[in-house]
Amino acid sequence: GSVGKKLAEHLANDGAKVFISDIDKSKLEKIDNPNIYCIDDAFSFDCDVFSPCALGAIFNKSSIKSLNCKIIAGGANNQLQDSSIANDLHDRGIIYIPDILINSGGAIGLTKDLMKRNEVETESDLMNIAYRVRKGLTESQEKSTSLQDAIKELIV
């Protein structure tokens, strides 16, 4: 999708090795970047970060068994089939950064345009996302809970 494409391009242009998969294989044929590689099965691929950016509800009790990543951080909405999956991922040592945090940057960008907010205010709000992720990760470790549970208090 368009979100995944932009993310892959940014990461690859910064020198990261990016491995991508898409249901629509014709989209993969159009990729022309030496740091982007096409793979068939993203779920079992050994990687640092798995970034689902299109379909929701892709993580369920069955699909997470084959995951071979350290972090899940993607722009797809509602990636978990149900909220208990966040705890299952946590139990497996996989950090799941909830889509509500990741996608909040888009909402902040919209408010900048719609409400005529200045760059300083917008940048401050964007930095607050990173702060909340770090704070949530700390609380998640301290309370031995998923990041999704830890951030519930931080979102309000």
Give the role of each language-model region.
Residues 51-55, 76-77:
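Short glycine-/small-residue-rich Rossmann-like dinucleotide-binding loops
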Residues 70-156:
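Adenosine-phosphate binding glycine-rich loop
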Residues 24, 55-56:
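A generic "binding-loop/recognition-motif" signal
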Residues 10, 30, 63-66, 88:
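Well-formed, non-transmembrane alpha-helical positions, independent of function
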Residues 40-47, 56-73, 84:
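Rossmann-fold NAD(P) dinucleotide-binding segment
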Residues 8, 17, 37-38, 62, ...:
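Metal-centered catalytic cores of metalloenzymes
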Residues 2-7, 28, 58-62, 80-82, ...:
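Short glycine/serine/threonine-rich phosphate/pyrophosphate-binding segments
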Residues 1-49:
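Glycine-rich phosphate/diphosphate-binding loop of Rossmann-like nucleotide-binding domains
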